[in-house]
Amino acid sequence: MTTVDEVVRATIARRGPIPIEEVVELALYHPQAGFYASGGRAGRAGDFLTSPEVGPLFGAVIARSLDTWWREAGEPQTFVVVEAGAGPGTLARAVLAAEPACARALRYVLVERSAAQRALHAEHLALEDASEAFASMPDVDGDHEGSSAGMPPGPIVVSLADLPRLPGPSVVLANELLDNLPFGLAEQTETGWAEVRLALDGGSLVEVLVPAQAFPEVAVAVGARVPVAAAVNVWVREAIELAGPGGRVVAIDYAASSADLAARPWTDWVRTYRRHERGDAPFELLGTQDITCEVALDQIVPGPTVSTQADWLRRHGIEDLVAEGRRIWHERAAIGDLAAVRARSRIVEAEALLDPAGLGAFQVLEWPGS
């Protein structure tokens, strides 16, 4: 089978040096040889851990937040949640297992561009055909109660390759998706910004600088690099439009300003993961390791509400769930049944999710739909 390395080399031989954004796109999402197509995934048996893989507590908190937003919306009979970058469906399973109050109204859409990851959804989730699941949804300006008559009760779960186009407000969730979108690299030189590209030199892949077509508006030292977050900005705009008036976009990820990123070594904020080992050569082993890049906040749609994951989880009730877990554990520890084990697990999971030196330091970005 053709490898990503071979595809990149052939592309350079044909066109000359290619943008880093294109290299990352091929490395992660090439339909046959890309990282996700060839088995790369989150999870303890995969290549990296995200909050949903820590355990079901994260999904239980998300379920509580969905209930809050559903009630704020007046408890509509149809409540659409779109999880973008759903991976193997771990978060969706945890949300549904928490049995949120909005379940009967819930239309949960998993969006995952990797066919290999998407194929895993049906293994643990009862999926419905999208055309049937949303055929009777109300129009944007329609009456929820009247228009939803005859719709089957939720939760209805759908798996798609791309963001859908649905009427009415939606909640769009993205956990560690933005850092997995293709990104460019810009470097400050004596004469201004230059774009970093990948070229061939004597059979080796090397970085070269070419005049930048667009560059970040930030003053940094010569030699400093910043990401170019054009693809992230496009995705956020599309998600805000999908959420619609009354909806919201919630993205959880690594994030910092371009100036802060420029002050650090670029290989500190461009990360690679393979079998839970972090690497330091993003453009080697193409297609066999995950490549992520911290989100440059000042380069994307302005105005999000920003909080740390730790603060956000506390605001949405994680401590109540942990207290409930402690109570169940004390009541059932002597029995040692599954309920006791799950309850005890909440305490351990919360420590990881709230860790200020780890997952708790992630940024939660929230935009209103429009």
Mark where each language-model region is.
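Conserved protein kinase catalytic core
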Residues: 118, 181-182, 259
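Rossmann-like AdoMet
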Residues: 1-84, 88-162, 166, 317-320, ...
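Short, glycine/acidic-enriched loop or turn micro-motifs at the edges of active sites
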Residues: 86, 115, 178, 256, ...
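A short SAM/SAH-binding and catalytic strip from SAM-dependent methyltransferases
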Residues: 158-190, 226-230, 234, 238-243, ...
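Long, Lys/Arg- and hydrophobic-enriched amphipathic alpha-helices
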Residues: 214-370
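A residue-level signal for conserved active-site and pocket-lining positions in enzyme catalytic cores
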Residues: 27, 172, 300
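A mobile, often basic/glycine-rich helix-loop segment
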Residues: 170-220, 263-273
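Generic recognition of stable, solvent-exposed alpha-helical segments in well-folded globular domains
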Residues: 3, 18-22, 53, 57, ...
